[in-house]
């Protein structure tokens, strides 16, 4: 069976076409369209018309690409930027009406559950009790569990793009020490409850996912992507702390010349590093394994394991639900 996933993130629309033989999603083609929605949409503001037009074009291109590769209609979802927009429903309906693709939004807690599932499958059962950190553009997801799905999840408004807008976009480049301190205080305040739970649980293995963590890991000395996904990659908390100081001393243009830091993400790399380092310190994690699987693989795994009815229910709930408020901590349900 060949299927596809379209992930509308804060910066990029990503397509993954995968074969699902043997219950494992094996990518056969990937593509991306850079929209930078987070630069056009402030937290809580509607998605502007011109951004919707670009989104429609990207989703249509992704759908046509998936069809050329012989994949079934894409499982399409949007994360924090669209999810939090007051005109969320109008955006979703416009995309479906003009592309034929039923785009839905995933609550942050569901994002965490699906990403945890992907990390569990990648790391294997021998990893034992597992903690997960996932920095997106609009939110930070934290999860912990001993089984297939997490026992609890937290979805917090601590995304790298969001915090860059709120704390580091005042015209100073590099950011001032005061700006960085204020950013770190925000992260500590909003993360403390979830971090306390992670410390109490005492995970055997900790993993980090997302492009933000992958790029920070490369900056901290992890092997480059050309070595392939099966190369072990780890990042120590102490090394990430050093990276925060290094990034804070540089302008965005200078950061883009560092190993691993791409030009489109250079401006938000400092905020991402502060979030990641603070999260690791508060949770007591000395190091994390960098996991190449994340939410797209999690969506595919749930679709493979639970069937099309699961995704149909996700789409139905997305159409009914109002834009959710941030959820600081929630017990996860294995029945979702």
UniProtKB/Swiss-Prot annotation:
Protein source organism: Streptomyces coelicolor (strain ATCC BAA-471 / A3(2) / M145)
Q: Heme: is it a keyword of this entry? A: no
Q: Please name the Pfam families in this protein's record.
A: Ppx-GppA
The cross-references to PANTHER family, in alphabetical order and at most eight, read:
EXOPOLYPHOSPHATASE, RETROGRADE REGULATION PROTEIN 2
Output the InterPro entries linked to this UniProt entry: ATPase_NBD, GppA/Ppx_hydrolase, Ppx_GppA_N
The name on file for this protein is: Uncharacterized protein SCO0757
Query: Keyword annotations for this protein?
Result: Hydrolase
| Similarity comment | Belongs to the GppA/Ppx family.
Q: Which Gene3D superfamilies match?
A: 3.30.420.40, Exopolyphosphatase. Domain 2
One annotated GO molecular function: pyrophosphatase activity
Q: List the SUPFAM superfamilies hit by this protein, alphabetically.
A: Actin-like ATPase domain (SSF53067)
